[in-house]
Amino acid sequence: MAYKLLVVDDDKEIVETLKTRLIKEGYEVTVAYDGEEALLKVQKDNPDVILLDLMMPKLNGFEVLKHIRENFKDKWRPIIIVSASGELDAVKKSYSMEADHYLSKPVTMENILRGIRTMISLIPARKEA
């Protein structure tokens, strides 16, 4: 069974590039283009891993992260922040809000895939805890 990923970014080109490559890698991919849509997809599709941009319309990535951690406690799902904001404050805030990994754009596909594989490798350990 393929792992389910949710890619959340308001840049349609980035989303489509990621989706195409991740599907080729064998993942099941759902996409969202803003924070509100992301929360609906988390509830509907129950993804295993979320790739989340910070700067988006409607709800930003921090708001989405907070909502997921407060309201979807039934399942631990790794959240990887993929953001153009490489500022130390954004990185610190992400980790303090329980993001699991942070990648600064521009980021290579190899680094994204490595981050996803690392987070997936932790899922069984988290389920046992």
Identify the role of each PLM range.
Residues 107-117:
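C-terminal output helix
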Residues 45-51:
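Active-site beta3 strand of CheY-like receiver
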